[in-house]
Structures are given as structure tokens and as C-alpha cells.
A protein has these predicted regions:
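A short, N-terminal "cap"/entry segment at the start of jelly-roll beta-barrel domains
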Residues: 1-40, 133-160
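Short acidic-glycine-tyrosine-enriched beta hairpin
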Residues: 11-13, 64, 71, 78-96
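Well-ordered beta-strand scaffold positions
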Residues: 25, 79-81, 104
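Conserved short histidine dyad/triad with adjacent acidic residue
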Residues: 29-32, 43-58
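Short, charged/polar surface micro-motifs in flexible loops or helix N-caps
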Residues: 35-38, 48-51, 64, 71-73, ...
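Ligand-binding loop in jelly-roll beta-barrel domains
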Residues: 36, 73, 93-118
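Hydrophobic small-molecule pocket/channel-lining residues, especially in calycin-type beta-barrels
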Residues: 51, 59, 72, 122, ...
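A contiguous, mid-protein "functional segment" used to position or interact
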Residues: 104-148
């Protein structure tokens, strides 16, 4: 049996999605939940040294990180571990997690299952019109508050 994917998937897999700023990092929505009938969404994060989101919990989805370039330290529950290119880790729903970029730059693909949380990223982002490497200003409190509608709860500061 073969599965025919709708055109948005084909378009997304060609990298046609425009990057945007979110919490100081560059993000691209590669595959939306709409393209997978809600099964998964895939985003690409490109960050610089020290970039770290607050420690947080997702109520609704598991998060799978796949490091493409660079070195990233992940915190998942009580575990702390370093990943490099080609390595993968899981942040299960309901478990506090975060990361911090250790190398000069890092890039990772993040899969959310099921999808839905990608809308939080998109609706709370800033356009990346001219990429001079300077992130657009952002309001952390507003982004954190908006996350509650998507089942994302901040439970601590970013890791150091």
C-alpha cells in the first residue's frame, strides 16, 4: 500500500518554509501538522552559543531532538547529557526539559508528536526579513503566557 501525501508535505520537504525568530533563535517550520493530519510536525532550530529556552513541560506532545550540527546539552527530567551531530534524544510529554547550545552554532531538527504546538511557535514569532544575525526583540512573558493555550508550562530558568 502506498500513501499519497498532500502537496503541502512535498512543498515543505523542499525547504520552502521561511525562517523566523523565536525566543532569540532562528526557526523554520518544515512540516506542519496540517500536512500530516495531526500526526507530527517538524521544525528546524538554528541557535548560537548559550541559546537556551526556559525549563518547560509539554502536556500534549512528545519532543524528539535530532542534532544536525554543533554540540547541545539537554536536560530531561533529572538527566543531563550532551549530544552532537547524528545523535537523537526524546523529551516525553509531562517531563520537564530544556537545552543549551555549547558550540558556536548548532542546528537541530525537532519533531513534535502529535502536532499542534508548532502554531505556538509561528504565532509568537518575529519575521526574519534581513538575516544580519541579530535576533528580533521578543517579550518572554507574553510568549510564556501564550504557551499555556498549547499546554506548554515554564517550570524553571534556562540551563546554564
Amino acid at each position: 500500500m502506498t500513501t499519497a501525501f498532500p502537496p503541502p508535505v512535498q512543498s515543505a520537504l523542499r525547504g520552502s518554509q521561511q525562517p523566523f525568530w523565536f525566543l532569540g533563535g532562528r526557526v523554520r517550520l518544515l512540516v506542519s501538522g496540517a500536512a500530516t493530519t495531526g500526526a507530527v510536525s517538524v521544525l528546524e532550530f538554528s541557535d548560537t552559543r548559550g541559546q537556551a529556552p526556559p525549563l518547560h513541560v509539554h502536556d500534549r506532545e512528545d519532543e524528539i531532538w535530532s542534532v544536525v550540527d554543533g554540540s547541545i546539552t539537554f536536560v530531561v527530567g533529572d538527566d543531563v547529557f550532551d549530544l552532537g551531530p547524528g545523535e537523537v534524544a526524546l523529551g516525553p510529554r509531562g517531563t520537564a526539559h530544556s537545552y543549551v547550545v555549547r558550540s558556536a552554532t548548532a542546528r537541530m531538527l525537532v519533531t513534535y508528536a502529535p502536532s499542534g504546538v508548532e502554531e505556538w511557535f509561528v504565532t509568537n514569532s518575529s519575521p526574519l526579513e534581513e538575516d544580519d544575525g541579530t535576533p528580533a526583540p521578543f517579550d518572554v512573558a507574553a510568549i510564556v503566557s501564550a504557551g499555556l493555550r498549547f499546554g506548554v508550562h515554564v517550570v524553571g530558568p534556562p540551563p546554564a
